[in-house]
Amino acid sequence: MAVHAQDTKKAHALRLIKRQGIARARDLEAAGVAVAYLRRLVEEGALEQPARGQYRLAGAAPAAGHTIAVASGIVSQGIVCLLSALRLHNLGTQTPHEIWMLIGAKAWAPVNPAVPLRLIRSRNLHEGIGVEERTIEGVRIRLTSPERTVVECFKHRNTIGLDVALEALRELIKRRRGKTDDLWRIAKVFRMQNVMRPYLEAAA
């Protein structure tokens, strides 16, 4: 009887994690799965821990954007931006080895995270402007929209390189078939319209 109960408990835990892809310990606890039991499943080889407080099925093929999902699980208030957002939007040819995330000026930042992070701090995150949501491996991802990503590439051009910003701008204008209204609107919010104007006119 006890063995059957354990099997049912294990099946319940694995089913929850399979559904989510990457599951957080606190969500699993809320669903009735204790952290101590999750540790046991890790020791048995049934689960893996991609990061502290996160669990996935052992041997599960990671989805595209897996490391971004892990990073967003660690820094849940962060916004994926710049090179990592370009990658998710398929703009340009950048393949960053770090996950670029925007966080508040005084926000908590992890020490020795499970994935390499490049955190950009800002006093005003402008969370209501050009921020989208996706779900990867069951984790909610917040990321800058294509237009905001391009604008921020120009804002941080001294860090990432002007060539990266120009490549992304050209591809976005081509994708939008020359329509730049949203791009201009966001450029004004970030006071980048004068910087971007000559490049926009040349690329249009």
Residues covered by each model-derived region:
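Nucleic-acid-binding surface
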Residues: V3-A31, Y37, V42, P50, ...
